[in-house]
Amino acid sequence: MNRPERLQPGVKLRDADKVARIPVKVVPSERETMLRKPDWLRVKLPSSNQRILEIKAALRKNGLHSVCEEASCPNLAECFNHGTATFMILGAICTRRCPFCDVAHGRPLKADADEPKKLAQTIKDMKLKYVVITSVDRDDLRDGGAQHFADCIREIRLLNPEIKIETLVPDFRGRIDAALDILATEPPDVFNHNLETAPAHYRKARPGANYQWSLDLLKRFKERHPTIPTKSGLMMGLGETNEEIAEVLRDLRAHNVEMLTLGQYLQPSKFHLPVERYVPPAEFDELKALADELGFTHAACGPLVRSSYHADLQAQGKEVK
């Protein structure tokens, strides 16, 4: 048997190369078998792309990344046009191979020690009042990247004292307590970690992750910081049932999670997991009603909702669909 080729630092693997060695093999989708996208998922493009170009230029100038671009988010045009972006720190190469995600896999480069200062200056230049900071998984780092998160939060607040910061963190696999110790030095205003799907679908959708670990991460952060809102997000359309999603909502509340996002999974390419169904808006409304009944302080549920979509409005408790 031939040994797998050693990954070269900084080389991005995408599509078939990315998912080649995951436990549940993804069969490339044929065009004729792919579900037709319904009208409710059509995204309206802004009349002008000037603001979009400005934000992209600001990111390129400082060598920064946005998850909006790296993960091919359908809301990129709307968010960029409104002057908001979700910044992705620690590079654009992930150590995991999740087959629903369009972020590249590979062997990441060393973290950029200047990134926290560059990020803070970019946010100041863009005059942002609310930012979301996320990252790729960095299983190659002893602390999973927690110190880099803390450094970014500190530098952002030094230059932008009035800003609100939401972190969308990885699962810090095997190092939760160490990561939370570090984050306690610079806690965010909102702590977000996505469960993504129901536990029965983790093996195919989140290889390398663990449902209970993710719940424990959210719960342990809340135990340390009872006044800081915790948040999680889920996708629909990966083969789960509505009852499975309902059970996840109950688990989240049992672990003291207060904010929820629930949206439709969209297949980035034919090499990613297929969309098994497009969930009608009425079903999102039903799950929103359940979330309210369970006691979530805010639940954004709709086909185009993403974990950082209008995150500032979500944090204010305003309706987002």
UniProtKB/Swiss-Prot annotation:
**One Gene Ontology term of the molecular function aspect:** metal ion binding
Reaction(s) catalysed by this chain, per the record, are: [[Fe-S] cluster scaffold protein carrying a second [4Fe-4S](2+) cluster] + N(6)-octanoyl-L-lysyl-[protein] + 2 oxidized [2Fe-2S]-[ferredoxin] + 2 S-adenosyl-L-methionine + 4 H(+) = [[Fe-S] cluster scaffold protein] + N(6)-[(R)-dihydrolipoyl]-L-lysyl-[protein] + 4 Fe(3+) + 2 hydrogen sulfide + 2 5'-deoxyadenosine + 2 L-methionine + 2 reduced [2Fe-2S]-[ferredoxin]
Q: Cofactor binding mode, per the note?
A: Binds 2 [4Fe-4S] clusters per subunit. One cluster is coordinated with 3 cysteines and an exchangeable S-adenosyl-L-methionine.
The record's section on PROSITE patterns has: RADICAL_SAM
For this UniProt entry, what's an example GO CC term? cytoplasm
Q: Which residues are recorded as binding [4Fe-4S] cluster 1?
A: 68, 73, 79, 308
Read off the HAMAP family from this record. Answer: Lipoyl_synth
Instruction: Write the protein's name.
Output: Lipoyl synthase
The organism of origin for this protein: Shewanella frigidimarina (strain NCIMB 400)
